[in-house]
Swiss-Prot record:
Keywords: Aminoacyl-tRNA synthetase, ATP-binding, Cytoplasm, Ligase, Nucleotide-binding, Protein biosynthesis. GO terms for biological process: glutamyl-tRNA aminoacylation. The lineage of its organism: Bacteria, Pseudomonadati, Pseudomonadota, Alphaproteobacteria, Rickettsiales. It is an enzyme of class 6 (ligase). The gene is gltX2. This is Glutamate--tRNA ligase 2. Its main location: cytoplasm. One of its GO terms (molecular function) is glutamate-tRNA ligase activity.
Amino acid sequence: MPNIVTRFAPSPTGFLHIGGARTALFNWLYAKHHGGRFLLRIEDTDRKRSTQEAIDAIINGLKWLGVSYDGEIVYQSKRIERHIEVANLLVEKGKAYCCCCPEDKVAEKKAKAREERKIYKHKCTSVIPDAKPVVRFNVPDSQEIIVDDKIYGHIKVNSDQLDDMVILRSDNTPTYIFAVVVDDHDAGITDIIRGSDHLTNTFKQVLIYQALDFDIPRFAHVPLIHGRDGNKLSKRHGATSVCDYEKMGILPKAMRNYLLRLGWSHGNDEIISNEQAVKWFNLESIGRSPARLNFKKLEHLNNHYINNMSNEDILTLMLGESTLTNKKKNYLLQGLTELKKRANYLTELLDLAQFYIKDPPFDLSEEAEQVVKSNLDIIKLLASFLSNIGDKNWNKGFLSSQVKEFSKLHSAKISDIYHSLRAPITGVMDAPGIIDIMIILGKDECIRRLQAV
């Protein structure tokens, strides 16, 4: 399928929603699968609600996700002259007309029609001097509008169910329904992949394409993402924006893999690399039912990708711009191998690794504090006992044998000795094996921590 061109066209009125992120991913994968191009257009004609902060969040969110666009970003607000030109062309062709009817009166009539379960067909005939008219599209009567959707199949609606929609407001700014058609045509968009909530818009836009003698692109309307309860996704279901997941410590690869599997499948494959996704992606494998968020699956994927990343890469992501001594970085590089098995999020991993970063004396967990209070004498004896071990013998085998020897010497349970080491050295009671930690920290640091309590 040659010359495929897809696009992602968000409105910058908020952060990048995961539904939008999935739409962008699907468009990107479809274009890459066919060797085509993927474009980014910012639909910012609503100047009151569009913000630079939201634009930056969209661009940064796509970059974080690894979804790269081709060419320059197109800003819809910079194309208004083109939209006006095409609207005037439709008026000249008799496909659109100027309407001076007050908007509140039109809204009132629409509401009344809805109450009577009728379709309000607005046809303006009034001319008001000095009024600033809107431009309405002249919807033809009794015309069958057909959409061969790549997901939902053959869908049709009668034009009598549609009203004459506004395509140009009284301030000469275009409406979404109209600007999208002009922009997609001028950009050479061949395939439009978007949420199923746009399906009603598609019937209206097909009429505009036909009125302008534009080639109609192929459409694929993707079912929306729902919460676990089956209701439309909202903030009450948890994180809904890409930046929320980034802050939680989700890896881009995990998020991309998770979004890919929300409504699309390739047999029983769960872990899908970027290369496999590009190779396998097709529209036929997108289901018609809404996908449901499942945070457990996302956690599972994130844990998988955390454990398949090198400790060096994980450390870079964890620390960001923060500075640590080389000694502490070395602690982390060695300790992450065990710690990352326990973490589903980078933030969780950073919390688990705090005992490698902090200097004694540091805060103890409630349980660790109780162990220290109950075993102060033993801890002091351990510090003295360990100081007699030579640096060359500071290895797992020798340390383990010495702990057993100490246990016998003081008639104490070996588990109590391990607890008496773990509590002051790590400050927590659920860290990995204490002997492994002691090997990483080294003799001097372990004794320093034992003495600090």
